[in-house]
């Protein structure tokens, strides 16, 4: 176990369960001797790790469950916490009991380590029956580290021109135009006189009967159907009086009357209102 620890290393020893004090003291003593006076060995229980005041990226090596009779189950939450405590390129050595079923197998532990951000994961030889030892390493970068991308904003070189033979296929020379053997279409002959006639709006209406519907104007309508639809919409906006006294003048009009402010007019006389007058005041 001391082989993974170097001089001047900061080591975190994580334990859990009912460990014997002499077993913990033996491991701490051997590690303290290995790291030397400039190193440090910190002892922490797994249940109190979340309230400990350890700084992030402060340990070179984390030894978890390496004492006698390990019982610590390394969840993803615990492994993610250990990854934050390790320095970049820091090492993690863990031991965990495994059962005969697939609920806690070495493959499951390795998968959890990968999801927690560890790399260079390897399984050591069997320490004891039903106990597995796995080593892993934190990547060489910190969590949330930033790096500059080598982006070039220099002008890009011009694209190579198309082959001359390919360009000549789509071009005509002056000699080709004067050549009598070349048939050129006259654009004035593409449309007949019937094509230039404006259609009758009545012919655009759909036939009556079951399943027949009204034709709608196209987006770029040029046949006059759009103007006809707009005219129908304008006629639908005709305003009717609910009191029948609007034509007498403002003295007989409501506060929201669209004719308010206009002079009196004859009953049945057509009065044109603007869009602003058709909208009531809020």
From Swiss-Prot:
Pfam families in UniProt: Anamorsin_N (PF20922), CIAPIN1 (PF05093)
Subcellular location: Cytoplasm; Mitochondrion intermembrane space
Domain of life from the UniProt record: Eukaryota
Motif position, Cx2C motif 1: 243-246
UniProt xrefs under InterPro entries: Anamorsin (IPR007785), Anamorsin_N_metazoan (IPR049011), CIAPIN1 (IPR046408), SAM-dependent_MTases_sf (IPR029063)
Subunit details: Monomer.
Protein name (record): Anamorsin homolog
Organism: Nematostella vectensis (Starlet sea anemone)
């Amino acid at each position: 176990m001391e082989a993974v620890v170097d001089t001047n290393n900061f080591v975190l020893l994580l334990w859990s369960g009912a460990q014997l004090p002499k077993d913990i003291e033996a491991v701490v003593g051997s590690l303290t001797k290995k790291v030397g006076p400039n190193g440090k060995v910190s002892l922490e229980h797994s249940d109190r790790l979340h309230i400990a005041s350890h700084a992030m990226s402060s340990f070179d090596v984390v030894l978890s469950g390496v004492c006698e009779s390990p019982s610590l189950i390394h969840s993803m939450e615990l492994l993610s916490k250990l990854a934050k405590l390790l320095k970049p390129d820091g090492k993690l050595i863990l031991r965990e009991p495994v059962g005969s079923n697939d609920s806690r197998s070495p493959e499951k532990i390795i998968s959890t380590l990968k999801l927690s951000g560890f790399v260079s994961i390897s399984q050591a030889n069997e320490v004891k029956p039903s106990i597995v030892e796995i080593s892993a390493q934190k990547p060489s970068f910190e969590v949330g580290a930033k790096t500059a991308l080598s982006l070039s904003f220099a002008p890009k070189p011009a694209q190579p021109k198309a082959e001359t033979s390919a360009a000549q296929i789509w071009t005509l020379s002056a000699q080709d135009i004067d050549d009598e053997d070349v048939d050129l279409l006259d654009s004035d002959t593409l449309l007949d006189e019937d094509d230039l006639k404006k259609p009758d709006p009545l012919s655009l209406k759909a036939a009556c009967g079951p399943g027949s519907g009204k034709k709608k104007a196209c987006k770029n309508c040029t046949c006059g159907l759009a103007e006809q639809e707009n005219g129908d919409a304008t006629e639908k906006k005709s305003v009717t009086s609910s009191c029948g006294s609007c034509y007498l003048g403002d003295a007989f009009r409501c506060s929201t009357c669209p004719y308010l402010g206009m002079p009196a007019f004859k009953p049945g006389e057509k009065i044109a209102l603007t869009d602003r007058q058709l909208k009531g005041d809020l």
